[in-house]
């Protein structure tokens, strides 16, 4: 017979890793086609000009240019990619 009782097993002690969501390219950053701009759950940010939205609501660039964020009157935030020639004339 053992003189020491065995320790019990625990049901706790595990957790899942974070999902690495959020803005990956900020306003006025240069992007190329296919660059991920935002990873999100749901449409916190909406796709604007020259960007696409993936099946998991990831917003990505369709053209080379500069990232721009704009807010509409109803409160929605849209993400655009402006061509470099247009963004140069704005600044």
Curated annotation (Swiss-Prot):
GO terms under biological process: translation
GO CC annotation, single: cytosolic large ribosomal subunit
One Pfam match: Ribosomal_L27
Polar residues bias spans: 1-13
Claim: NADP is one of the keywords in the record: no
MF term (GO), any: structural constituent of ribosome
UniProt keyword annotations, A-Z: Ribonucleoprotein, Ribosomal protein
Stretches for region Disordered: 1-20
Family: Belongs to the bacterial ribosomal protein bL27 family.
The protein's name in its UniProt record: Large ribosomal subunit protein bL27
Native source species: Anaplasma phagocytophilum (strain HZ)
Gene assigned in the entry: rpmA
């Amino acid at each position: 017979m053992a003189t020491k009782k065995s320790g019990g097993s625990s049901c706790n002690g595990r957790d899942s890793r974070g999902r690495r969501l959020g803005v990956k390219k900020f306003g006025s950053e240069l992007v190329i086609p296919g660059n991920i701009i935002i990873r999100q759950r749901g449409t916190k940010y909406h796709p604007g000009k020259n960007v696409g939205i993936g099946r998991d609501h990831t917003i990505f660039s369709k053209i080379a240019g500069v990232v721009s964020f704009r807010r509409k009157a109803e409160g929605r935030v849209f993400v655009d990619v402006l061509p470099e020639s247009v963004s140069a004339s704005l600044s």
